[in-house]
Design a protein with these regions (language model features):
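Residue-level detector of alpha-helix initiation sites
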Residues: 58, 184-188, 396
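Extended acidic/charged loop-beta regions that coordinate divalent cations
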Residues: 111-112, 171, 225-266, 301-385, ...
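Gly/charged, well-structured mid-domain segments that form the phosphate/adenylate-handling core
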Residues: 389-391, 405-433
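Cofactor-binding loop segments of dinucleotide-utilizing enzymes, especially the Rossmann-like FAD-
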Residues: 56, 79, 182-183, 209, ...
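Flexible loop/N-cap segments at domain edges
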Residues: 402
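N-terminal leader/targeting and accessory segments in enzymes
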Residues: 3-154, 161, 391, 411-414, ...
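Phosphate-binding loop of NTP-binding sites
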Residues: 4, 35, 44-45, 68-69, ...
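Short beta-strand "acidic-cap" motif of Rossmann-like dinucleotide-binding folds
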Residues: 74-78, 205-206, 312
Length: 433
């Protein structure tokens, strides 16, 4: 499966490049959208072609559809009987069959047979790795050296393939990926991040646990776009611990674990495993957006703060350059302000120039130390917490996290504040009735 079979790939070909030339170019760049990052020599690797998708939920449907569109072989399995499927799931199954799905198995239990001839298992996030029948499935995969991917792993590889395809066509597509997880506040923070980035003039795609599935959204934007310019500039992803468990190559521009408390222990087994799954959100090159109020989160990333760019937020005054916090003005009965430790003008001008070129160079901690220690922090008041339409101190922290994520994508503060004021919140979350 060569990557030129990618859905709607023909619009990605420059007019002066013939299809034959483009095919030859693509063979030198990567084999197909399942190889992952294009940094390694794709010609030396064998891309997976045969997939077992386990679970007909939203993610399972998205994975199966993505693979079928790419021309890969798909086997779909679900532990439920066909008669137990909901109307929506029956519609999904009909859609997949129209795309060429013929190999299905319901009330699945014989994994040894289902895994025959399979290169990769795509697993739905609702299936716990420590519970049967998933535990037996994973054990069998390990014995056979069969990879297990989440839907987000498929998404990451598809996005990297799209970036490589742009490069082959002498174009540039390098979107920012802003990834959010945590026990609480994920949906609000993601929706708010997407809105303020859009308010700053960016084309934003919001997907993941918040719905739609990331792969479904990726397929949709590719199908609708006529050129690279029409693709999202920023992807905002809400990711659960379930989705992160089998994700390996996602490397977000910035990532945050908003907070951590005991949750989903029946799925993970214990708090340590739960926290470890959450920590997978941080990629090799990601800016860490860190909640300094949460002791569990700060301990989880204690070893990361010296090796990468960190933007902190919390309910007290900022402690580092470019970090965020809350300060109280004792006048007028006490007003809480969202505040920012503003970088110097030279730094801001440099970031603006880099952002206009389509990328941000995140300085390592060693390069920041001299500046941080040489001057007092310049604390800038942004907006009163009461100016937010979403209420509660927890939502003020969600707003700070959104600002930090947008800053990591190279966006200036001023247009983001308009988006903060306008955000009305999500349904059934601290609503006035």
């Amino acid at each position: 499966l060569d990557y030129y079979h990618f859905v709607s790939a023909r619009w990605l070909i420059k007019p002066e490049i013939t299809l034959e030339t483009f095919k030859e170019k693509m063979k030198q760049v990567l084999q197909n959208p399942f190889l992952g990052q294009a940094g390694a020599d794709a010609s030396e690797r064998s891309a997976p072609q045969r997939f077992l998708i386990v679970g007909l939920g939203e993610s399972g449907y998205a994975m199966a559809k993505w693979c079928l569109v790419q021309g890969a072989f798909v086997r779909l399995a679900d532990t439920r009987a066909h008669v137990e499927l909901l109307t929506r799931q029956i519609d999904w199954l009909d859609d997949l069959q129209k795309l060429g799905l013929v190999d299905t198995c319901f009330e699945s239990s014989d994994w040894s047979t289902l895994l025959d001839g399979i290169d990769v298992v795509g697993i739905s996030p609702g299936l716990s790795p420590i519970q049967e029948p998933t535990f037996t499935l994973l054990s069998e995969c390990q014995k056979r050296n069969i990879a297990v991917w989440s839907e987000i792993e498929f998404f990451a590889r598809g996005l990297y393939a799209l970036e490589a395809l742009a490069m082959a066509a002498e174009e540039r597509y390098k979107p920012s990926i802003l990834a959010v997880t945590g026990t609480n506040g994920k949906t609000t923070t993601c929706a708010l991040t997407a809105q303020i980035c859009e308010r700053a003039g960016k084309h934003v795609a919001l997907a993941g646990n918040i719905s739609p599935a990331a792969l479904e959204k990726l397929l949709s934007v590719i199908t609708k776009a006529n050129n690279f310019i029409e693709l999202p500039e920023i992807w905002v992803l809400e990711l659960s611990s379930f989705q992160l468990q089998f994700t390996y190559t996602l490397d977000p521009t910035a990532a945050t674990v908003l907070n951590l408390s005991q949750d989903h222990l029946d799925w993970h087994g214990d708090m340590q495993a739960y926290a470890a799954a959450k920590a997978r959100i941080l990629g090799k090159n990601s800016v860490l957006v860190l909640n300094r109020d949460d002791e569990v989160v700060t301990a989880l990333f204690a070893d990361e703060k010296e090796s990468r760019k960190v933007i902190q937020f919390g309910s007290d005054s900022p402690v580092d350059i470019d970090s965020f916090g809350i300060e109280r003005d004792p006048r007028a009965g006490g007003i809480d302000w969202l505040v920012w430790a503003e970088p110097d003008e030279a730094t801001l001008a440099s970031e603006l120039e880099e952002a206009q070129e389509g990328f941000i160079k995140h300085k390592r901690r060693k390069k920041l130390d001299a500046y941080e220690k040489s001057d007092e922090l310049r604390i800038k008041r942004l907006i009163p917490a009461d100016a937010l339409r979403i209420r509660g101190r927890h939502n003020a922290l969600n707003a700070l996290a959104a600002l930090a994520l947008a800053r990591a994508a190279g966006l200036g503060i001023s247009p983001l504040l308009h988006g903060l004021r306008e955000y009305q919140g999500e349904a059934h979350r601290v609503q006035t009735v």
